[in-house]
Curated annotation (Swiss-Prot):
It is an enzyme of class 4 (lyase). The active site is at residue 60. Its EC number is 4.1.1.23. PANTHER family: OROTIDINE 5'-PHOSPHATE DECARBOXYLASE (PTHR32119:SF2). Catalyzes the decarboxylation of orotidine 5'-monophosphate (OMP) to uridine 5'-monophosphate (UMP). The lineage of its organism: Bacteria, Bacillati, Bacillota, Bacilli, Bacillales. This is Orotidine 5'-phosphate decarboxylase. GO terms for cellular component: cytosol. Keywords: Decarboxylase, Lyase, Pyrimidine biosynthesis. InterPro entries: Aldolase_TIM, OMPdecase, OMPdecase_AS, OMPdecase_bac, OMPdeCOase_dom, RibuloseP-bd_barrel. Pfam families: OMPdecase. The gene is pyrF. Disulfide bonds: none annotated.
């Protein structure tokens, strides 16, 4: 996978995606999430790949093991670069996801969502009824993902250093919640700058609105890219 900032294509239509991608004359690493995939379907993935871009298909699969395994068999045929599941589904579910993926695809990396970067300590305790710190909850889910054989996790940059210490440098830490200095926090709570994410051990960063909603997306992307790749 490219070591580039992953741009979250948080658009509702293929037309808006193409308008955005047409601004760039270089190969990108982009994220297609539920909103866009459910609107446009697999054909959009094929078109983005044909343009030479890497794709993170962010569907966060979470169901019984058999269902997730079968779903991953279908997604494997899209030949994206990165897919994910929810670690809360457990080791068996994650193992079945890998089996389904590998039936048709040996190259796609698979990672697990630990805790969303919108999660707060209060939400963790009172809504999820998890009576530990966010850091401990993330570590527990990351250990389950590692035990299942996944390539890494989605986590906040604030947990990256801990996960590197516990699970090694090759374990992927894909981190949303990235905001350049002075940018709006939006609905993210556990955030850092690109430079801080690199220093903390993130292997990849995901950036959406600071690029896609910028007055000059190309310039904003290059600034984030430069600060990430220092």
């Amino acid at each position: 996978m490219k070591d580039l900032p992953i741009i979250a294509l948080d658009f509702e239509s293929k037309e808006k995606v193409n308008q955005f991608l047409d601004l760039f004359d270089e190969s990108l690493f982009v994220k297609v999430g539920m909103e866009l995939f459910y609107q446009e379907g697999p054909q959009l993935i094929n078109e983005i790949k044909e343009r030479g871009h890497d794709v993170f298909l962010d569907l966060k699969l979470h169901d019984i093991p058999n269902t997730v395994g079968k779903a991953m068999e279908g997604l494997a045929k899209l030949n994206v670069d990165l897919v994910n599941v929810h670690a809360a589904g457990g080791v068996k579910m994650m193992s079945e996801a890998i089996k389904g993926l590998r039936k048709h695809n040996q190259d796609t990396k698979i990672i697990a969502v630990t805790q969303l970067t919108s999660t707060t300590e209060d939400m963790l305790r009172h809504e999820q009824n998890i009576q530990t710190s966010i850091e401990e909850a993330v570590l527990n889910y990351a250990k389950l993902a590692n035990a299942a054989g996944l390539d890494g996790v989605v986590c906040s940059p604030l947990e990256s250093r801990m996960l590197t210490e516990k699970l090694g440098t090759s374990f992927l830490k894909v981190t949303p919640g990235i905001r350049p200095k002075g940018a709006s926090q939006n609905d993210q709570h556990r955030i850092t700058t690109p430079e801080e994410a690199r220093q903390l051990g993130s292997t990849h960063i995901v950036v959406g609105r600071p690029i896609t909603q910028s007055d000059n997306p190309v310039e904003s992307y290059h600034k984030i890219k430069e600060s990430w790749l220092v």
